[in-house]
């Protein structure tokens, strides 16, 4: 099986940190990009988190988003442009935002599943 090149958004949050840890221990994933909404001046698992989301996503096959709704739509806009698959773990969307996600899902594959944190 070919490895999945993975980008994780919201890499400094609890779920982002868990995803980094899990992806590093799973031979099916190759962690290629980390993004955060603020500049981080240290490497995490050998990768420096980027504020430039579009450049970060180019090498990925799959983007996992654990940010906030506002950031999720920035992720979806870029992922749609680059034709990338997205897993959304972000919660707290309004009904209008849920409809917008459905529209994006007609352009790119999206798996949306809230409450993926450990213990749920």
Feature map (PLM): residue ranges:
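N-terminal Rossmann-like NAD(P) cofactor-binding module of classical short-chain dehydrogenase/reductase
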Residues: 63-64
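Extreme N-terminal starter segment of soluble prokaryotic enzymes
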Residues: 2-6
